[in-house]
Amino acid sequence: MFEKNEKPGGMLTYGIPSYKLEKDVIDAEIEILKELGVNIKCGVEVGKDVTIASLREEGFKAFYIAIGCQGGKLPGIPGEDAKGTSVAVKFLHDATVDKSTILNGNVVVVGGGNVAIDCARTAKRFKANKVSVFSLEDRNHMPATNQEILETLDEGIEINNGYGPKEIIKDENGCVKQIVFKKCLSVNDPVTHK
């Protein structure tokens, strides 16, 4: 198995915060794989450090490519390239790699699913002054589980429902200064339900 990161486990290791899934549980599962004979080489990116052709030359005969979730999606609004913005996957990965990170100021998380909630709760643990979640959906239709929502509120994180991002305003250094939201009356078209 070739893993481009320094530790195996993919999203289990780098995408799920340790307050939800302790890393020693993942490590134990990986040890079982090793005991079964799986040889794991970390820090090797297929297509960059090795190629399918070079692996064939080494004697590999079959390939299973499981690249997982490699990135996130920005909302396509003006200013989203401002310094200080991040997609969820990168934020959670960086938080796992560098646990000494301290967030200064306020953090806004856009989204209403469990991954957005993970980002908000992680930001709170990294000492953000204030964490606010903005979700298109109303509270009863948020994709996040009710338990996740309640735990988020218990941690003092504000959830604002029915808002979508319109624009990120940058300061003179290209950093996020503020984010402008628009009120969302309905997520789905009442006629087509799309």
What residues fall within each predicted segment?
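Thr-Gly-centered strand-to-loop micro-motif
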Residues: G15, C42, V110
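Conserved catalytic-core motifs of eukaryotic protein kinase domains, centered on the activation segment
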Residues: P75-G79
